[in-house]
């Protein structure tokens, strides 16, 4: 009997650290792989895996937050990370997988270190222009780190593959689910979609609630992350979370206002959507979204607006600039070669694993 192929995934803390895993896992399952996931049972990764219904065995470990600054909590978290490494060693030694694939986040560090100690090949994916602290640690233990952006040639274990996204690869017909929304929208107005992400939605939610000029001048779609805001009324659709409707809503939008998370902005690039990036600042993040926004603006894919400057007047100006120069932005996006299909990346990953 042929030896069963096994792979372990890890990554979590935010939806962005799980999305690529959820794209890849069905492909491994389809090809007969046994799939395991190491994460935190209280984290978004467990919620997303559970919600997906995929045939994945989930293993929960202790996890501690990694901080760049002094905190007494660091002392406790050192023990949590150490315990997480021991748990991961026991889990991975029992599974004996062909590889571990990590999408980053604090929870990924123990499984990455454990895999290296057990001589299991470690493949890591980095979405942002600069590495987060977890992936800086993971790089030291990685066999290969795949990157969305070009990295310094001194990082010899990196391999630039571009952004991996399934959004934009297929087109959707108008769904019946959209009919009720369209009935409330004015076809003479531009439709603006606000996407806040799992960590940055509140500012957009509050802004929409406090800015009546928005629904007087635009049709507004707000993916809010907050079910208490769900509503469908004249010129306004607010929903906490979407799956099948995600791309149809993107298709529906003329303009998108988004945070600077790598997954979302590359989805918008794939769909060639006019978009304004309002990145999380350094007070709320490590500055990765600022770097991503600068890169997209420099390449001519998008405009950006800093959060402290967000007002009805500034937003209106930025959206008008996108519309006025729409052809220039769309031409730049059309010329980009920064998108990799999930199938191509899956084949590359499987080949890399097979060659080890």
UniProtKB/Swiss-Prot annotation:
<keyword id="KW-0133">Cell shape</keyword>
<dbReference type="Pfam" id="PF04101">
    <property type="entry name" value="Glyco_tran_28_C"/>
</dbReference>
<dbReference type="GO" id="GO:0051301">
    <property type="term" value="P:cell division"/>
</dbReference>
<dbReference type="GO" id="GO:0030259">
    <property type="term" value="P:lipid glycosylation"/>
</dbReference>
<feature type="binding site">
    <location>
        <position position="289"/>
    </location>
    <ligand>
        <name>UDP-N-acetyl-alpha-D-glucosamine</name>
    </ligand>
</feature>
<keyword id="KW-0131">Cell cycle</keyword>
<dbReference type="GO" id="GO:0050511">
    <property type="term" value="F:undecaprenyldiphospho-muramoylpentapeptide beta-N-acetylglucosaminyltransferase activity"/>
</dbReference>
<keyword id="KW-0328">Glycosyltransferase</keyword>
<comment type="similarity">
    <text>Belongs to the glycosyltransferase 28 family. MurG subfamily.</text>
</comment>
<comment type="pathway">
    <text>Cell wall biogenesis; peptidoglycan biosynthesis.</text>
</comment>
<dbReference type="GO" id="GO:0008360">
    <property type="term" value="P:regulation of cell shape"/>
</dbReference>
<dbReference type="InterPro" id="IPR004276">
    <property type="entry name" value="GlycoTrans_28_N"/>
</dbReference>
<dbReference type="Pfam" id="PF03033">
    <property type="entry name" value="Glyco_transf_28"/>
</dbReference>
<comment type="function">
    <text>Cell wall formation. Catalyzes the transfer of a GlcNAc subunit on undecaprenyl-pyrophosphoryl-MurNAc-pentapeptide (lipid intermediate I) to form undecaprenyl-pyrophosphoryl-MurNAc-(pentapeptide)GlcNAc (lipid intermediate II).</text>
</comment>
<dbReference type="GO" id="GO:0071555">
    <property type="term" value="P:cell wall organization"/>
</dbReference>
<dbReference type="GO" id="GO:0005975">
    <property type="term" value="P:carbohydrate metabolic process"/>
</dbReference>
<keyword id="KW-0961">Cell wall biogenesis/degradation</keyword>
<keyword id="KW-0573">Peptidoglycan synthesis</keyword>
<dbReference type="GO" id="GO:0009252">
    <property type="term" value="P:peptidoglycan biosynthetic process"/>
</dbReference>
<keyword id="KW-0808">Transferase</keyword>
<dbReference type="InterPro" id="IPR006009">
    <property type="entry name" value="GlcNAc_MurG"/>
</dbReference>
<dbReference type="GO" id="GO:0005886">
    <property type="term" value="C:plasma membrane"/>
</dbReference>
<protein>
    <recommendedName>
        <fullName>UDP-N-acetylglucosamine--N-acetylmuramyl-(pentapeptide) pyrophosphoryl-undecaprenol N-acetylglucosamine transferase</fullName>
        <ecNumber>2.4.1.227</ecNumber>
    </recommendedName>
</protein>
<feature type="binding site">
    <location>
        <position position="198"/>
    </location>
    <ligand>
        <name>UDP-N-acetyl-alpha-D-glucosamine</name>
    </ligand>
</feature>
<keyword id="KW-1003">Cell membrane</keyword>
<dbReference type="InterPro" id="IPR007235">
    <property type="entry name" value="Glyco_trans_28_C"/>
</dbReference>
<keyword id="KW-0472">Membrane</keyword>
<keyword id="KW-0132">Cell division</keyword>
